[in-house]
Amino acid sequence: MAANYWASSQLTQLFLSTDLESLEPTCLSKDTIYQWKVVQTFGDRLRLRQRVLATAIVLLRRYMLKKNEEKGFSLEALVATCIYLSCKVEECPVHIRTICNEANDLWSLKVKLSRSNISEIEFEIISVLDAFLIVHHPYTSLEQAFHDGIINQKQLEFAWSIVNDSYASSLCLMAHPHQLAYAALLISCCNDENTIPKLLDLIKSTDAFKVILCVQRIISIYYFEDIE
């Protein structure tokens, strides 16, 4: 397991090192928003921590990006499996029987999910991702900013919810976790003239332009449905 993001597979193997502007059409869409809502709905039913759901959606997005051919798995089956896998990765395992039962109760699937279905899809996802399953999230940078006294509890909670909302897009594949965290902090602290200078000092350590692009993309999430 790579404790250091800069040495992790997330950066060295799975990061989309491209311009956010060129990927705007695929960064946010009805599909990405719907996928995140499905993950949240199923995760809430299982009463899982937000970090588990975030890992699940990242695994789902990685898989959908890298798969070479259509396997015919339904979105619901993929979500259930990604959450099952995410629970293992985040060390809060849920029994496969519980995953199947809750999925079948929640969704009216043509074919009921079985343990063998989940195991098959789990193997497929692990194979496609070459077993690179560890996910680094922006939450760590948010917590660090709070512990360093840069932000207060209310600002931390607001930024946390903004990071949660960012998973409705594919930004998690295109920006470094700390850049997403800084973008969320800029939004949550935009009216605090005492905190903004401290955040600007933080941003100096990274690509400030990309942080601003992340701010724009995150804000667009809240307007997307109105625009559509």
From Swiss-Prot:
Q: Which UniProt keywords apply?
A: Activator, Cyclin, Nucleus, Repressor, Transcription, Transcription regulation
Q: Does the keyword Transcription apply?
A: yes
SMART domains for this protein:
CYCLIN (SM00385)
Residues in Cyclin N-terminal domain copies: 10-134
User: Per its UniProt record, what Gene3D superfamilies does this chain match?
Assistant: Cyclin-like
Highest taxon, organism lineage: Eukaryota
Bridged cysteine pairs (disulfide): none
Q: Name one GO molecular function term.
A: cyclin-dependent protein serine/threonine kinase regulator activity
User: Looking at the UniProt record for this protein, which Gene Ontology cellular component terms does it annotate, in alphabetical order?
Assistant: mediator complex; nucleus
Query: What does the record list as GO biological process?
Result: positive regulation of transcription by RNA polymerase II
State its location(s).
Nucleus
Share what the entry says about its subunit structure, partners included. Answer: Component of the Cdk8 module of the Mediator complex. The Cdk8 module is composed of srb8, srb9, srb10 and srb11.
Matching entries from PANTHER family are given as:
CYCLIN
Q: What does this protein do?
A: Component of the Cdk8 module/Srb8-11 module which is a regulatory module of the Mediator complex that regulates basal RNA polymerase II transcription. The Cdk8 module may sterically hinder the interaction between Mediator and RNA polymerase II leading to transcriptional repression of a subset of genes regulated by Mediator.
**Family, per the entry?**
Belongs to the cyclin family. Cyclin C subfamily.
What protein am I looking at?
RNA polymerase II holoenzyme cyclin-like subunit
Organism of origin is Schizosaccharomyces pombe (strain 972 / ATCC 24843)
- Which gene carries the instructions for this protein? srb11
